[in-house]
Regions:
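Transmembrane alpha-helical segments in integral membrane proteins
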Residues: 12-23, 75-98, 167-192
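Membrane-interfacial entry segments at the cytosolic side of transmembrane helices
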Residues: 95-109
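Terminal transmembrane helical module of multi-pass membrane proteins
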Residues: 143-201
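Short, Lys/Arg-rich, polar N-terminal cytosolic tail immediately upstream
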Residues: 1-10
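Long, glycine/tryptophan/cysteine-rich extracytoplasmic
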Residues: 37-65, 69, 133-161
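Hydrophobic alpha-helical membrane-insertion segments
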Residues: 18-41, 108-132
Length: 201
């Protein structure tokens, strides 16, 4: 039997947990966008030769660190972390929502971005910053990539190469979603007869 009301009370905490779980893997990309926004507010251009600083820190150093973090997330997700992460998301969905189809649709909406974006997020985050001195590519040629007056070469080129990991990570996420849906439907079928027996009794 389908429940008509969504979770309340503690459900709000689980919904917030789901939002956090979806956003956390993309913190490196969010950081790059924020650094770029701050740099441009300060009058800096991505193609500038002079170093651009946000307070005591160079914008290029912040971007380089965020790119490395994004690549680490992508590597982790492509080798099984995505399944663990999605399991946590599914737990939050089950605890935060009661309707079966709400759970399935939310699981799909969560699984799709986590199946693809971790591998392309680093590359997409620096694509607006590409300039005459920075052309990220798989071959890493030329080895340098200057953004806001600093070299982010190796991490920028790795951001392009890491996209291939989607062919490992995406199937893992798809299998995790299918397992969740099957488990949800099986659990629903087991619950319905029990509820029917209680009503008739």
């Amino acid at each position: 039997m389908e429940t008509n009301s969504e979770g309340s009370g503690g459900g709000g905490r689980w919904r917030f947990a789901l939002l956090a779980l979806v956003l956390i893997p993309f913190l490196p990309e969010i950081a790059i966008w924020l650094v770029s926004f701050g740099a441009q507010l300060g009058g800096c251009e991505p193609s500038a030769n002079a170093p651009c600083h946000l307070g005591p820190l160079a914008a290029s150093a912040l971007i380089r660190g965020a790119l490395r973090a994004g690549s680490m997330v992508a590597i982790g997700f492509s080798f099984g972390l995505s399944a663990v992460w999605l399991a946590l998301c599914y737990l939050a969905i089950v605890r935060g929502w009661r309707r079966r189809w709400s759970r399935i649709l939310l699981a799909l909406a969560t699984s799709l971005p986590l199946a693809v974006l971790p591998y392309f997020g680093p590359m997409l985050s620096i694509s607006p910053l590409v300039n005459a001195e920075c052309h990220p590519n798989e071959g890493g040629i030329p080895p340098w990539c200057r953004i806001y007056g600093g070299d982010v070469g190796d991490p920028a080129h790795e951001a392009v190469r890491i996209g291939w990991n989607v062919f490992i990570g995406a199937p893992v996420a798809l299998v995790a979603f299918l397992v969740f849906v099957v488990a949800l439907l099986v659990a629903g079928r087991r619950t319905s007869p029990q509820q029917g027996e209680r009503v008739s009794g």
